[in-house]
Amino acid sequence: MAMATSFYCSTAIPSKKTNQNRENFLCSPVGGSKTTPSYIRLSTRQSRTLSLVVSAAASGAAVEAEPKFAAVTPSKILSFRVGHGFDLHRLEPGYPLIIGGINIPHDRGCEAHSDGDVLLHCVVDAILGALGLPDIGQIFPDTDPKWKGAPSSVFIKEAVRLMDEAGYELGNLDATLILQRPKVSPHKEAIRQNLCQLLGADPCVVNLKAKTHEKVDSLGENRSIAAHTVVLLMRK
């Protein structure tokens, strides 16, 4: 019997082919998607039959694969899911500055299609990301006039509904605001409490931090505001 050795392992290779206990796997979009394929376990006989079907189809013959080959393995349900969200908006005179649903006094605010709440937007994206769903811009496109000037609490409530529908609850949330001015510390607790209320979460699982950008680039020059959020979702 010939032996093949690699850096990782040593595997015995039989001198002749054998069909004993042979299994084949077919990657198919049935029950999955183009980006998340499902795997179908085929016996040797089924594999040969399917090869004939594919060959016949390639030659132009009208042949249909039997449905019994489309049995798929159910998706694994995860106990925990982690998501990250990021958002940034320009700061312009004449707009309100709303952070976490709280109106913050300032000489400029966020220019955006909705109310421009950078914190709530990135929280929504973090939840959607953890659930493996499209981002906030796809679910609430800025090309849709019905979201013009909409309060971001609408987006948060929809994200919470989707989370609940998927069978998950918030384990914890950690958010970071990045802006040069104004100082967030006088308003931080009000922002956090409102965020907890919108999420239906205990305050002990929601954390909020604020950082300046050391007067570097648009964030440090009071021309923009940004936020990052990480969430942990737990299976109910």
Curated annotation (Swiss-Prot):
Binding site for substrate: 87-89, 113-114, 117-125, 135-137, 140-144, 179-185, 210-214
Gene Ontology MF term list: 2-C-methyl-D-erythritol 2,4-cyclodiphosphate synthase activity; metal ion binding
Record site feature (Transition state stabilizer), residues: 113, 212
Enzyme class, spelled out: lyase
First-listed, main subcellular location of the protein, grouped into a coarse class: plastid
Subcellular location: Plastid, Chloroplast stroma
Biological role: Converts 4-diphosphocytidyl-2C-methyl-D-erythritol 2-phosphate into 2C-methyl-D-erythritol 2,4-cyclodiphosphate and CMP.
Protein's UniProt name: 2-C-methyl-D-erythritol 2,4-cyclodiphosphate synthase, chloroplastic
